[in-house]
Amino acid sequence: MSDAPDPSSAANAMWGGRFAAGPDAIMQAINASIGFDKRLYAQDIRGSRAHAAMLAAQGILTSRDAEAIGEGLLTVLSEIEAGGFPFRVELEDIHMNVEARLKELIGEPAGRLHTARSRNDQVAVDFRLWVRDQCDAAISGIEALMRAFLAQAEAGADWVMPGFTHLQTAQPVTWGHHMLAYVEMLARDRSRFKDARARMNECPLGAAALAGTGFPIDRHMTAAALGFDRPTANSLDSVSDRDFALEFLSASAICALHLSRFAEELVIWSSAQFRFVRLSDRWTTGSSIMPQKKNPDAAELLRAKMGRVLGAAVALFTVMKGLPLTYSKDMQEDKEQVFDAADTLMLGLAAMTGMVGDMQANRESLAAAAASGFSTATDLADWLVRELNLPFRDAHHVTGTLVARAEARGCDLPDLSLAEMQEVHPGIREDVFAVLGVENSVRSRTSYGGTAPDNVRAQAARWKELLGDAA
């Protein structure tokens, strides 16, 4: 009787040669990643087909074996996409599940596929391909939301509303200018995803476990086949690098922050106390007890869900911060964070695009709010500087005194009489009242990047051209 262990009872037929027994059930549960990394099936099969083609081109595989592998992998792909593929936990991950099924389909040639390859570089290329695709999806989602904000900006280029600091009225601005602020934020988000995509577009396949391989492989061939610009230059870095995932999460977190900020504004603006916007029935819900309620649940949920994206970034940074080179099993914890962040961000982008596209601004409420709260006080101070040659600090003091008087009277600055103003400074003239109107205030803000309606229209046209939407 042989003392050799039965391969069927070993830990895993793919790596169990030195093991006499299989893992504990709890170890198997900890170790298995198929429950989440099966999402990489398309990338895994694509990478394997490119690897097999390269091995054949280099004479490492026969053309017959390479053809059988390629066709077998397409069969596996079809089975998975049909929804009936029997993923097996004991095979741990997507790589082993695909290879095991390939062996069932084509037999011995399947065992040759892993020549000059390790799961370390295999998962690195699979994951990089997936994240690269997700960068493209995020860019498309961001551009759709930018267009929704641009439509609002064009429609409301001259609608006056209050600009806020500390959530208190500061100065009049235009609705269009406020919408364009989010276009600018989203443009930076788009740029971050584009930058991250460009940086991650190097192929780690061929780094093998960590040291490269002695087989005469052509890494440039596989890199080109998979749409990468070049192969990675250091095999140690190739298998240990998760910067691409961290960059994706960082860009996602900043984008999520922007979505959450506008979601917060929608919650505030749609309240009865503000009445700045009306959200459509598509993005609101009612109450089971209060018939009058129309709750901004989509905005509230989006505001909360975006926190998950920030949490995912922190989680992966925490996983990676203490790892020596090269691969450690800790790195298996990278995918769930990225998958959840990507799903959450894409859902948030789609929901926000719908809400922005449907929302209706209440011009009357916006204008009324803009005209209250002494919003043109800065215009008055500027007038004192321009017309009376006061130092700005003196003009600031005079204006503050007038605000205090108006507040004591229970009125706004335009409601003070000329005589009351002249009691504070005798040089004030009748023409001061022209700068105290909110419409004149926003029209005067013509500096580059300012809120003047003509500026808003010009910026909206510029962004439409940059997005390829110009007429």
UniProtKB/Swiss-Prot annotation:
It holds the Pfam family Lyase_1. InterPro entries: Arg_succ_lyase_C, Argininosuccinate_lyase, Fumarase/histidase_N, Fumarate_lyase_CS, Fumarate_lyase_fam, Fumarate_lyase_N, L-Aspartase-like. Its main location: cytoplasm. Transmembrane segments: none annotated. Pathway: Amino-acid biosynthesis; L-arginine biosynthesis; L-arginine from L-ornithine and carbamoyl phosphate: step 3/3. One of its GO terms (molecular function) is argininosuccinate lyase activity. Its EC number is 4.3.2.1. It is an enzyme of class 4 (lyase). GO terms for cellular component: cytosol. PROSITE patterns: FUMARATE_LYASES (PS00163). It catalyses: 2-(N(omega)-L-arginino)succinate = fumarate + L-arginine. It is found in: Cytoplasm. GO terms for biological process: arginine biosynthetic process via ornithine; L-arginine biosynthetic process. Keywords: Amino-acid biosynthesis, Arginine biosynthesis, Cytoplasm, Lyase. It comes from the Bacteria. PANTHER family: ARGININOSUCCINATE LYASE. This is Argininosuccinate lyase. It comes from Cereibacter sphaeroides (strain ATCC 17029 / ATH 2.4.9) (Rhodobacter sphaeroides). The gene is argH.
